[in-house]
Structure formats: structure tokens, C-alpha cells
Amino acid sequence: MTDETYMRRALELAEKGAGWVSPNPLVGAVIVKDEEIIGEGYHERYGQLHAERNALAHCTKSPKGATIYVTLEPCCHHGKQPPCTDALLAAGIRRVVIGSKDPNPLVHGKGIRILREHGVEVTEHVLEKECDAENEVFFHYMQTKLPFVILKYAMTLDGKIATYTGASRWVTGEAARAHVHRMRNRYRAIMVGVGTVLADDPMLTCRLKETENGANPVRIICDSKLRTPLESQIVRSAKEIPTILATCNRQEAMHMPYIEAGCKILVTPEKDGHVDLSDLMQQLGQLGIDSVILEGGGTLNWSALQAGIVQKVQAYVASKLFGGTEAKTPVEGQGFHTLSLIHISEP
């Protein structure tokens, strides 16, 4: 089998850590000796063994002289775990095949250099594009210290997210909704506007099948004037599921009922009557929140695009037609006045 074949297996393993290792990267590793896979591993939980050490621990025979395929450059510094380069050298690994170079300045090329200095053959850039995509959140956060924001919405064939009366359940079917819950498991936080809370009273939790493990995202409500009802499901469950209210309201007396209910309050400057989303992203990044699913209505979505905080758009299109000039669309507001302001890159 080829290097690409083994690296694809390492990518499959890396994916198993989705939702559990943030803010660490997703990493998978496969150890091969005499064209036989003798060990596999992935980074399973934040703070626990890295993929390389897990793969070494699961070897069915001595890894001395073997090749390890790892989706991300092995670390070479002491964090919650010791350097993986040390483990690979101690195990006698002969060759290391790497997908992505680690953007962490504590590593970035240093792990590769250490291995080569000790006589280990290193092959880089194998399925690099796929490995980079697997860790797009980690790469973005490591380079900017801002959350990676994905704008998600479901719409009809004629581009509507709700009827003119506001009815929106359900635009899409079960398959799309199941995919959304897998996204919620993968991303660190989910953000909506207060209008969504007032209209739908959602829980914004991760509901996966019993056979899957689901981690609830941090819930963020953009509520400039603090109109979120104290009796809403989100506020009532805030002591069990981390919940943030982002507001422009600086009156501490109005903050207290939410704080007592378990919510965290983040105050931003006001921008056009709304929460300053750029400032909010700075604060979320400082809290270690590396990724956000934006499930807002048309107004919040437009504000996010206008603020330039969105890195990716995920659209689900249903085979339905709502019609109506008053029906809600995914992006409202004034809109861009010229095509030259619109820049979209395809994956």
C-alpha cells in the first residue's frame, strides 16, 4: 500500500477525536512494519495521550524500524503531555510520514528538525490539503487567537429560511438535522440572536444517537438589550450547560438574575444598535473558545458577514418552495452594494 493509503487511515482515526480534544488539534497515527499495520492511535481527549503515544501503546509487535504515519507534525515541547518526538526516538521509529506542519510556534518545523537530526527519515506533505482541512479550526485559532466561525443555515430552493409568518420547522429533513448535531459536537460553541430565543425557545444542545457520544457546545446569545427571558430553556439550564449572554447593556443590576441562573455575561461596545461581533470574537478567543457555529437569523447573519468574522458557510437546501416577498432569507440587512466586495473561496 502507498503512503497516501496509510495517511487516509490516520485521517479516519483523527476524526474520532472531534468534539473531545478542543482546543487541541485532531491527530491520527498509524504504525506500519513490513507492510503490516502494527499499531493505531488518535488523540482521544484533551490533556490525554497524543496520537503517536497511543499508537505506540497499541503496537502488536516491536515498533523498532517501523514507519509511523501521522496527520500533524509530532510535538517537541512539554505541555500536558511530554514530547512525542522523544517517544518516537525511544521506540526506534525509522521513518515518519507527516501530513501537516504544526502551526504552533512551539513546534512549527522543530519536531521535524529534531527527528532528522537523530537520523530519522521524514517525509512531509502527504495528503497535506486533506490534513490541513481536518484541522482548519486549530490552524485558524493558532494563527489568529480568534474563533473559527461557520455560518450555518437551512433554506428552501427559493432561498427562504422561514415563511412570511416566521414558521421554520422543519425546512430540512432528518438527515440534515442529524448532520447539524454532529457539527454541534465538533464545534466549541453555538451562537444565535435573541430573536431566535424569543421565537423558538431552543435548547441548542447536541442530540446524537445513543451509539454516539455527544458533547454540548457552549451556548452564546447575542442580546444587546438583555431581552432573553429568564424562564427560557437556555437560561433555566445554564448551570448544566455553559451559557454566555453577549450584550451592550452595562447595567449590572440587570446582569445579576442571569448570573445567578448560571449564565456568563460578556459586555461589548454597541455597533449599529447591536453587539459588536468583532469585539465579541476577541473576548471568546481569550476564553479559549476556538470555534463557533452561527445559527442566527438573517439580521445576525448579515452583521456577521459585514463584520468579517465568518470563515465558512454551510448551507442545507431543501426541495421546498416558500415564496413570498416577506418570507425570511438567510442574509438580510442592507446587503453588499457591489460584487467586488464579495470574496468566496471554495474548499
Residues covered by each model-derived region:
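Enzymes that bind and transform nitrogen-containing heteroaromatic metabolites
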Residues: 3-8, 13-17, 22-24, 80, ...
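A broad detector of short, well-ordered amphipathic alpha-helices
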Residues: 8, 12-15, 39, 50-53, ...
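A short, flexible N-terminal coil/short beta segment enriched in small residues
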Residues: 10-14, 23, 34-41, 130-143, ...
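Proteins enriched for Cys/Gly/acidic motifs involved in redox and nucleic-acid/cofactor modification
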Residues: 20-23, 48, 112, 126-154
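Short beta-strand scaffold segments in enzyme catalytic cores
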Residues: 27-33, 153-154
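Zn2+-dependent cytidine deaminase-like catalytic core
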Residues: 31-130, 218, 244, 249-251, ...
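Short capping loops/turns at secondary-structure boundaries
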Residues: 104, 108, 124-127, 142-146, ...
